A protein has these predicted regions:
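Catalytic core of non-heme Fe(II) oxygenases with the double-stranded beta-helix
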Residues: 81-177
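Non-heme Fe(II)/2-oxoglutarate
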Residues: 2-96
Length: 177
C-alpha cells in the first residue's frame, strides 16, 4: 500500500467522531502551526473576494507557498484520503482523481470576523486550526446548526466533514486575536 495508514484499524484508532459525518484527528504539531502562523503574519497577499457567494479573507496555499502545497498534497493523498475511505464506509476515492483547493482563511476583528451559514461545493471539507482558542484568539468556531455542534478543534487538529448537502455551517464571530 502506498499510504501511511496501512490498515483501517490504524485510521480508526487516530480518529474521533464529533457528530454525524464529522471526524477529527491530530494532524500538525504545535511547532509547525506556530511557524506557519508567524510566516503568515508577514504575508500581504490575502484576498477578500475569491469566493463569489461566501468570500473569505484567504490565500490559496499553492500561491502562498508552492513547496508547502506539494507537501500538503502528499499528506492529503497518503493520510487524509485513506482515512476518508475508512471512516466514510463505502468511499473509494483514489488520489489520481481526487482534487483539492486548499486555502488558508484568516478571521480577524475589523477584517473578517465570521462567515455566514453556507454549504461548501466540495465533496469533503477540512477545517484545520493553526491557532489555539483562548490563547491566540477568542470566540469563533465553526457551527453546524442542523447537528447543533460547534467545532473548535485544538491547534493542529483537523476536522473532516461532507461539503455539499448535509453539513450547512458558518463561522461564529472572532472577538479578539
Amino acid at each position: 500500500s502506498s499510504h501511511l495508514l496501512t490498515t483501517s484499524y490504524e485510521a480508526k484508532l487516530i480518529t474521533n467522531k464529533l457528530s454525524f459525518g464529522m471526524y477529527s484527528f491530530h494532524y500538525f504539531t504545535d511547532a509547525f502551526c506556530d511557524e506557519l502562523v508567524k510566516d503568515l503574519k508577514g504575508f500581504d497577499g490575502w484576498t477578500k473576494d475569491r469566493h463569489g457567494n461566501y468570500p473569505t479573507n484567504d490565500v490559496l496555499l499553492e500561491e502562498y507557498n508552492p513547496n508547502l502545497h506539494q507537501i500538503y498534497s502528499t499528506c492529503i493523498n497518503n493520510i487524509v484520503l485513506p482515512l476518508i475511505n475508512t471512516v466514510y464506509e463505502g468511499s473509494t476515492f483514489k488520489k489520481e482523481n481526487f482534487n483539492h483547493e486548499t486555502f488558508i482563511v484568516r478571521y480577524k476583528p475589523g477584517i473578517q470576523n465570521s462567515l455566514r451559514l453556507h454549504h461548501d461545493s466540495s465533496t469533503f471539507s477540512i477545517i484545520l486550526n493553526l491557532s489555539q482558542d483562548g490563547v491566540d484568539f477568542e470566540g469563533g468556531g465553526t457551527y453546524f446548526p442542523q447537528h447543533e455542534v460547534l467545532v473548535k478543534p485544538p491547534k493542529g487538529h483537523l476536522v473532516i466533514h461532507p461539503g455539499k448537502m448535509t453539513h450547512w455551517h458558518g463561522v461564529r464571530p472572532i472577538t479578539s486575536g
